[in-house]
Every structure is written in structure tokens, then in C-alpha cells.
Amino acid sequence: MAESIEWVEKYRPQSLTDIVGNKKSVVDMREWAQSWLSGTPEKRAIILHGPAGVGKTSAAHALARDLDWETIELNASDQRTAGVIERVAGSASKMSSLTGTTAKRLIILDEADNIHGNADRGGARAIGGIIKNTDQPIVLIANDLYGLTPSVRSLCIELKFNSVQGRSMIPAMKRICVEEKIMCGVGVLEKLAESAGGDLRSAIKDLQAVATGRDEIHIEDIATSERDTKESIFKVLGKIFKSTDPKKALEATYGLDETPENLIHWIDENLPLQYGTEEGTQEDLITGYEYLAKADRYLGRVRKRQSYRLWRYAGALMTCGTVVSKTHVGRGFTKYQPPSFWRKMGQLRAKRDMRDNIASKIADHANKSMRYSRTDLAHLYGRMLEENEYAADVTFDLELSIDEMVYLTGKKKVTKDIQRIHDLAQAKRRSLGRDEGKAFFEKKPKKQTPDKKQMDLTQIINSTPQEDKVEKKETENVPPVKKSASKAKPQKTLFDF
């Protein structure tokens, strides 16, 4: 039995009522969408986050189908730079529906936590700007919530999609077997659901793979090999901090999709939250950091010598050392935090990117180098932004965003003056168009008879006293030329050949 289409696509949920599991998140999605029908809600975007294959993307498309909304989707296969996101999602968030009705357009940004690298430069920063100004609902889909910047998360409603339970997968797979006219026992479906590890999409793919060429499936037809699963970092941290067995804590890291370079930051951030919070446990905290320091030495040798065999010793020290350093196990719930080091590095990187982006605009505008624009001209343009006479023209000429204006002026947040100047520049851009605008230092010529002796400002700046003297001398020495009926044919030179 050959299939030209994957069952995952063929039986994709057409409505939110068809979504398997995560009923609470589905209800919250519907309530958020309903709030758009009565105006613009406070939170204009939602984040659907959770492991792969649990129905996040399907839920977003089903929501649009239930409300008869158009959809615009950007996923990992698309280039998602700041320009692309602003051109596609930004324009879509402002324009009306293609049908001309008042129906909304749902903007879906899949794998939003994977916007990084040179291919997607500036994309993460553009998302925040679009969410702030959008008139259309936006859905961000992510496997790792902390892969999104804190500024973006603060603008959104966070809805978690958990792994689908096996007993919820079985009815969905049974309906597929009925539609495909395949005889299949409940034991087979239970085995497929168990091996999927909460991933409904993988379970359906496994079912299709087993059913290919068969009309009946038996338990013997299912491969006994188990699917590779990845442990959540939060589960691993719980085993490290709550366990009393160093071996189990170390084995928990084997299925973790994190390097020792990253794991040590997680342990470093959450060690004070777990140890040292109660009286008499300060020694546990000190001992734990001593083991982390030893692990960090091995990581330093890895970076210096490129000897990745030393990772095993670093991993053992940071996990087993954390376990043996505690004198008693805390039983309360602890909310583990992502490393603040990453957040600070991300903020510094964002500032550097903004600085270089502004310097690039100034360099193009002033015809200077990036380095000179960054070190010498940036503060001058910042001063001009504080002058009412030039501020709107500078903003218009450089096409500055509000965040770039805040950075140039050295303010900590958007002020009323910055917002007013940005609005004036935007109004000028809409009325004139970018190509018709004049540079802020150029004045429009008056409608009068041109004077041969009068030079405009650009000529005055570019001319030198020596050139003026030479030009004047040549003008005095050249005799007047008599007008003739036909112009003399210019003499050819070697360069004409």
C-alpha cells in the first residue's frame, strides 16, 4: 500500500476540537483569539512552546480555520532577517484582509526560538517591534521558551503544550486505521504510543511506516528498538539537586542535549537557589562551588588544548560533585532559572549589533568608514537628534528606528520627544517617499534666476581657495569666443582611439 502523502498532513486537525491533549492551552488560545474580535487586546501575541510533535503548529492553523482568518507563516526554511520579517510579517500586520473584509490575518512564526546566526541577523529584534505595533494577531511557536529573548516573552502570553499522553494518542491512531481500512489491535497502538515518548507526530509516522504494504498489523511487525529521547534540562537539574546517588545524576545527563560548557552555567545559576537557603547549609554551597571550580578547570583545558576527552571529567565533577556536596536533600519545589550569563551576553550582543547597524547607516550617509562613523560621528548625530531643527530630518535620512534613536541619544527609554520626532519622520516618508527626500543638511533652492557667481552649499564645502584662484585666473586669461554658425569639431586625442 503506497501513499503519496504523509498521514501527518492528511489527518492534520482541521479544528481546535480535533487537537489531541493540552485542552487548557487550547481553551486559552480560543479566548485570546476571541478578544481580537472586540478590539486589540493588551497582549497582541502568544507563544506556543513545548516539545516537538505535540500539535503547536496544527493548533495555530486550526485556530485560523475556526475563525475564518487568513494565515501568513514564516518557518525555519525561510530567511528571517530583520528586513524579511518587517517586509512580510510587518506589512501583513498592518494591511487588511485580501478579501477586503474585516477578518483578521493570523501571522504564524514557526521555530521562533531558532532565529540566530548570520542568515537571520536582526530577526529577533524585529519580532519585538512588530508585536508592539501590530494590528493583527501573532502566534510564535517554539520548542525552547528560553530561546526567545526576555523582551519578546514579556510582550506575549505563554501557553505550554505538554507531551501527549499515550492513552490520548490511541483514539487518534485508531481513527486513522479505520479511514485507511487497516486491521490493528489495541496492543499495537499502545506499543506505538509508548515508543513515541509523547510525540504524536512521530507515533503517526511510525504507524504509517509499519502499515505500508499491509492490510493488518500485528505486534510482531513493530520494531523493538526504542526511540532516542532527549531529557529536559529542568528534569536533569531536578535529578542533580534532589538525588543522593551520584551515578544516577551522571546518567541523567547522557540524554541531555547540552554540552558541559552549557550545563555548568545552569548548575552555577541554580546552585544558590537549592543550597544555602536554609540554616546550616552554607557549607553545602561552598563545597558545591569548589567542585564547579574544578570542573571549570577541565573545561578551560578543553578550550586550550582542544582535547574533548576531558569533557567526561568536567561532567562528572559538576554533577557528581554537586550531589555529594549536600548534607541533606531539600523537598520543596524549586523554580530553576536559565543562566543570567546568557542573558547578559545576549544584551551585549544586541547592543553591539545596534551600534554597528547605526554606524553602517551613518557611514553610507556621510560617505565615511564604519570605524570613523562609530567612533567620531555617532555622538554628533546623537547631538543633532536633540536639536528640533534637524532631528526629524536626521531620523528620516538615516531611517532610524525608535530603539536606534534611544541608543543614539543615550536615553534609557522612549521619551515623548523621541516618539514625536519618529512620527514626524514617518509622516515625511509616507508623504514624499524615500527617494524624494532631501538630506537634512541640504536646503531647497529658491525659484529665481540662477546667478552664475552663486554656489550652493555642497559646492562651497567641496571647493578650496586654491581651486577658486585657478578658476578665476583661467577665466581672466581666456579671450571671448566668437559665436559661429557651426561648432568647431573637437580635436581627437590618443584616448579617443
From Swiss-Prot:
Q: Where is this region: Disordered?
A: 428-497
Q: What SUPFAM superfamilies does the annotation carry?
A: P-loop containing nucleoside triphosphate hydrolases
The record's annotation in SMART domains points to: AAA
A GO MF label: ATP hydrolysis activity
Disulphide bonds annotated for this chain are none
- Locations of Basic and acidic residues compositional bias? 428-455, 466-476
Quote the biased-composition stretches of kind Polar residues, using this chain's numbering.
456-465
Binding-site positions, ATP: G50, P51, A52, G53, V54, G55, K56, T57
Q: Which CDD domains match?
A: AAA, HLD_clamp_RFC
Give the GO terms filed under biological process for this record. DNA replication
Keywords of the record, alphabetical order, are: ATP-binding, DNA replication, Nucleotide-binding
The cross-references to InterPro entries, in alphabetical order and at most eight, read: AAA+_ATPase (IPR003593), ATPase_AAA_core (IPR003959), P-loop_NTPase (IPR027417), Rep_factor-C_lsu (IPR023935), RFC_lid (IPR047854)
| Its biological purpose | Part of the RFC clamp loader complex which loads the PCNA sliding clamp onto DNA.
Q: How does it assemble?
A: Heteromultimer composed of small subunits (RfcS) and large subunits (RfcL).
Concerning its family, UniProt says:
Belongs to the activator 1 small subunits family. RfcL subfamily.
* PANTHER family per UniProt: CHROMOSOME TRANSMISSION FIDELITY FACTOR 18, REPLICATION FACTOR C SUBUNIT 1
In Swiss-Prot or TrEMBL terms, this protein is called Replication factor C large subunit
What species is given as this protein's source?
Methanococcoides burtonii (strain DSM 6242 / NBRC 107633 / OCM 468 / ACE-M)
